[in-house]
Curated annotation (Swiss-Prot):
Pathway: tRNA modification. It catalyses: cytidine(32) in tRNA + S-sulfanyl-L-cysteinyl-[cysteine desulfurase] + AH2 + ATP = 2-thiocytidine(32) in tRNA + L-cysteinyl-[cysteine desulfurase] + A + AMP + diphosphate + H(+). The thiolation reaction likely consists of two steps: a first activation step by ATP to form an adenylated intermediate of the target base of tRNA, and a second nucleophilic substitution step of the sulfur (S) atom supplied by the hydrosulfide attached to the Fe-S cluster. Belongs to the TtcA family. Its cofactor is Mg(2+); [4Fe-4S] cluster. [4Fe-4S] cluster binds at residues 120, 123, 211. Keywords: 4Fe-4S, ATP-binding, Cytoplasm, Iron, Iron-sulfur, Magnesium, Metal-binding, Nucleotide-binding, RNA-binding, Transferase, tRNA processing, tRNA-binding. Gene3D superfamilies: HUPs. Homodimer. One of its GO terms (molecular function) is sulfurtransferase activity. This is tRNA-cytidine(32) 2-sulfurtransferase. The gene is ttcA. It holds the Pfam family ATP_bind_3.
Amino acid sequence: MSEELTPQQVTRMAKLQKRLRTEVGRAIGDYNMIEEGDRVMCCLSGGKDSYAMLDILLNLQQRAPIKFEIVAVNLDQKQPGFPEDILPAYLDTLGVAYHILEKDTYSIVKDKIPEGKTTCSLCSRLRRGTLYGFAQKIGATKIALGHHRDDIIETMFLNMFFAGKMKAMPPKLLSDDGANMVIRPLAYSREKDIAEYAGLKGFPIIPCNLCGSQENLKRAAVKEMLVQWDRDYPGRIETIFTAMQNTAPSQGVDREQFDFLSLTRDPDAPMRGDVAESDLPAFDFVDVANNGHINLDKAVRIDVVNTYTPD
């Protein structure tokens, strides 16, 4: 830590650590992210999220009922001014196994992306390909990324608004070739908790704008929208995330997710609705279309006393 914390800050940090540890443990359990004997490759960017992820996983490793390895990996993409000494120095203090990789993806990105355009998408794809390959090389069974709950929700809205897809970041993902399993242990954790925890812990943060790329304006707009919602309607973000875990394909419009074409009614089904009328009190209403008086009675269910049939 860069400076001495007050007793109140120490207490707050312990509370945040417990919360994050609980959330990460629950996410790991819910999605079976880490199993006995796993070698987990924690990808570090030098940002608050990946630092917090490594910190919490190391903490859980000491408490978990199963045994698993943790290997920290950072990819130096040769961005101008990247401080090469910060991560090794920090990781040395932890005593965790680590690898620092070097690959000049920066030059590739600058060559392919016009000046002034955001480079984040291509940069991340090149980084992912390098990390996937290295994970296989060292025998890593899981690749842990530092995306949190807010990232997942933002991605869903980005895809809805700009790509016409209901798609987010899954907490657990098998790569297209089936060779790598990606996990996101912070899937249940809020960004503001992670940011506060990182500040109290004094992680040596490396800025992500060394490449000079403009911020992804679409993601920034979605993030601001969610921040405003959280401010104006407390609990809305939690409700959105809960909704993402409770989808009902049969109640949607995606024909790939539900077979609407094969739906058929059962002509032998009993004459009843979703609610058993026998459990409802008798009541009357007027059939506006036919001007007929319909009485719903517990004994006879439906008694039509007047019906009009056109010639």
